[in-house]
């Protein structure tokens, strides 16, 4: 059938491409206008390879005469939504028909294969590309090294990187790989790559160092990042404002405000570069997190004097800082000031204010802001809900808290354990463990898995009600799903079992904890364990 169809299609192709007595205009009811004869061939070949690799002499002979690199590229492009079939065509045309494919065919198909997760096939194509004498450009190499690194194939990505040193603009390739590794939290791999392969190359630029500094600061290694700043000039690279902003943020994150402040002063002096809104916002954020609101406010005044206008982020940082410090009047003043600068309060602003009011016991004011948010058409996020739920539980308003939990689905908010845990804890402390169990069932139905805190709350709650067998059952479920109990969980359960005269169960439970020690299941402390054994 396929052979007959192909023969008919070939005849049709020749009719329109070579003219003669058989050639005639297309009818008015034809669905597709054929602009050139090659389009027919592209369509025929694409359709043919969707079903099978041609194996008849007729197909082979015809394709060997009429396929060329241009038509081959068009076929690959038509099959772009199915790269596996595109690879099948490329493999057939290269090895059976000796088609020398263009860079654009290799570029398109290797990208499509990677996007489909077919990295092994993409790797094969890349090797053939090199053996065919087709050189990749820096954009393709940059894409490939990032894609292979994301797939976990760092060895191949590194091999591609080493080849890029021969390509103009290799900095782009280097930075693509380093950036991918940092995004994947593989900062050690990024630094190892730099130390082993990049220190002795000329393909590093300021962006290279900025990526590494960002990665190190992100994992709390601001001091190590500072060392990179010191060696940049040796590579012919000068730090820019992004470099300094990243370091300031890193030191603030590590609670090293003195070092952040020193670097801020260097930038402010103009000896290295001029500060921008990110510089000031980073430093303000550091002071706010440390509770130094006077210094943070002073920096806001300073940046305004210099004509550096704050953004929503700047104001939100200040609102959050004052709210956490319990200075709600000042927090509200900042909200008013941000409007005067054309920065309008958003969900982050309101969430910080709600958190502040709940912290000082003014939950009703928090709900007034909640209503204001809804009136403005703002959608509360998971943190907004969590703050109010926790505040309600602290006031033993458990039914209202549960009502808020019920709104999550209608608001398209993905439920998280930290939203449910305060409510479960509240019902357990009130002795209503059955209600707590129902809530856990509800969260599991919503694909929200209980975490270590959830299980610990349930275990202690059941113990306090004397429901020891249920508590032990919850413990076994916790271990079975790979959630490792901590010392509080284990010691609380064992203590309750011993008090209930269930020494044998306590012994077996502690043995389970010891067996799971290598998997981070924490056994009972030795002294208590000995008491358990003695009781047995």
Curated annotation (Swiss-Prot):
Keyword Ubl conjugation attached: no
InterPro entries documented for this protein: Mito_RNA_Proc_CCM1 (IPR051114), Pentatricopeptide_rpt (IPR002885), TPR-like_helical_dom_sf (IPR011990)
Keyword set includes Repeat: yes
Domain of life: Eukaryota
Coiled-coil zones: none
PPR repeat extents: 102-136, 137-167, 170-200, 205-239, 240-274, 276-310, 311-345, 346-380, 381-415, 416-450, 451-485, 486-523
UniProtKB keywords: Repeat
Pfam family, one: PPR
Family, as annotated: Belongs to the PPR family. P subfamily.
Protein name as catalogued: Pentatricopeptide repeat-containing protein At2g06000
Organism field: Arabidopsis thaliana
């Amino acid at each position: 059938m396929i052979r007959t169809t192909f023969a008919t299609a070939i005849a049709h192709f020749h009719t329109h491409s070579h003219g003669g007595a058989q050639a005639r205009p297309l009818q008015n009811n034809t669905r597709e206008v054929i602009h050139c004869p090659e389009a027919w061939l592209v369509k025929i070949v694409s359709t043919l390879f969707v079903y099978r690799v041609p194996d008849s002499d007729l197909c082979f002979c015809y394709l060997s005469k009429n396929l060329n690199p241009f038509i081959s590229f068009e076929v690959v492009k038509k099959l772009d939504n199915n790269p596996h079939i595109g690879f099948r065509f490329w493999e057939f045309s290269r090895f059976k028909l000796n088609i020398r494919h263009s860079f654009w065919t290799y570029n398109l198909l290797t990208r499509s294969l990677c996007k489909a997760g077919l990295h092994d096939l993409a790797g094969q194509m890349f090797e053939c590309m090199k053996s065919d004498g087709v050189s990749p450009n820096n954009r393709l190499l940059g894409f490939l090294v990032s894609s292979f690194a994301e797939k976990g194939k760092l060895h191949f990505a590194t091999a591609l990187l080493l080849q890029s040193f021969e390509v103009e603009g290799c900095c782009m390739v280097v930075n693509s790989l380093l950036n991918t590794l940092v995004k994947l939290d593989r900062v050690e791999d990024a630094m190892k790559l730099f130390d082993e392969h990049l220190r002795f190359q000329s393909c590093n630029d300021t962006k290279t160092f900025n990526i590494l500094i960002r990665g190190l600061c992100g994992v709390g290694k601001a001091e190590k990042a500072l060392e990179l700043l010191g060696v940049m000039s040796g590579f012919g690279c000068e730090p820019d404002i992004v470099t300094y902003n990243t370091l300031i943020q890193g030191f603030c994150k590590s609670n090293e405000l003195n070092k952040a402040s020193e670097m801020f002063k260097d930038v402010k002096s103009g000896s290295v570069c001029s500060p921008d809104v990110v510089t000031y916002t980073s430093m303000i954020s550091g002071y706010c997190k440390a509770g130094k609101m006077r210094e943070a406010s002073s920096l806001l005044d300073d940046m305004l004097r210099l004509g550096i206008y704050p953004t929503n982020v700047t104001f939100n940082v200040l609102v959050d800082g004052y709210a956490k410090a319990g200075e709600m009047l000042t927090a509200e003043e900042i909200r008013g000031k941000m409007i005067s600068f054309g920065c309008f309060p958003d969900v982050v602003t309101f969430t910080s204010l709600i958190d502040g009011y709940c912290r000082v016991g003014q939950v009703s004011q928090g709900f007034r802001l909640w209503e204001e948010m809804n009136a403005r058409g703002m959608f509360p996020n998971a943190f907004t809900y969590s703050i109010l739920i926790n505040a309600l539980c602290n006031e033993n308003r458990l039914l209202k808290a549960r009502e808020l939990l019920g709104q999550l689905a209608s608001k398209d908010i993905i439920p998280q354990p930290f939203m449910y845990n305060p409510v479960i804890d509240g019902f357990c402390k009130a002795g209503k463990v059955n209600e707590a169990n129902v809530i856990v069932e509800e969260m599991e139905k919503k694909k929200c898995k209980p975490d270590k805190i959830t299980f610990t709350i349930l275990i202690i709650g059941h113990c306090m009600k004397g429901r020891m067998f249920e508590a032990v059952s919850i413990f076994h479920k916790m271990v079975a799903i790979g959630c490792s109990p901590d010392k509080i969980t284990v010691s609380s359960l064992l203590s309750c079992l011993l008090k209930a005269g269930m020494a044998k169960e306590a012994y077996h439970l502690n043995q389970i904890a010891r067996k799971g020690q290598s998997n981070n299941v924490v056994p009972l402390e030795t002294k208590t364990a000995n008491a358990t054994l003695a009781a047995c």
